[in-house]
From Swiss-Prot:
Record-linked Pfam families: ATP-synt_8
Localization annotation: Mitochondrion membrane
InterPro entries in the cross-refs: ATP8_metazoa (IPR001421)
GO biological process, one term: proton motive force-driven ATP synthesis
Segments traversing the membrane: 8-28
Function statement: Mitochondrial membrane ATP synthase (F(1)F(0) ATP synthase or Complex V) produces ATP from ADP in the presence of a proton gradient across the membrane which is generated by electron transport complexes of the respiratory chain. F-type ATPases consist of two structural domains, F(1) - containing the extramembraneous catalytic core and F(0) - containing the membrane proton channel, linked together by a central stalk and a peripheral stalk. During catalysis, ATP synthesis in the catalytic domain of F(1) is coupled via a rotary mechanism of the central stalk subunits to proton translocation.
Cellular component, GO, one term: proton-transporting ATP synthase complex
Protein name: ATP synthase protein 8
Subunit structure: F-type ATPases have 2 components, CF(1) - the catalytic core - and CF(0) - the membrane proton channel.
Membrane topology: Single-pass membrane protein
Record-stated family: Belongs to the ATPase protein 8 family.
Amino acid sequence: MPQLNLAWWLLNFFLGWTSLLVIFIILLNTSITNNTANTSTTTNTTPNLNWTWN
């Protein structure tokens, strides 16, 4: 029954693209929060002496 095969193919095709479209729209509508840099941290200024070449 090729009609049933075509019907299942069309159903899966449209369901797949519809789900991808819904996921893409949801991802586009989510707000991206801008995280500010953490200025309270300090960097370590001690030299790294582990890499000594003979």
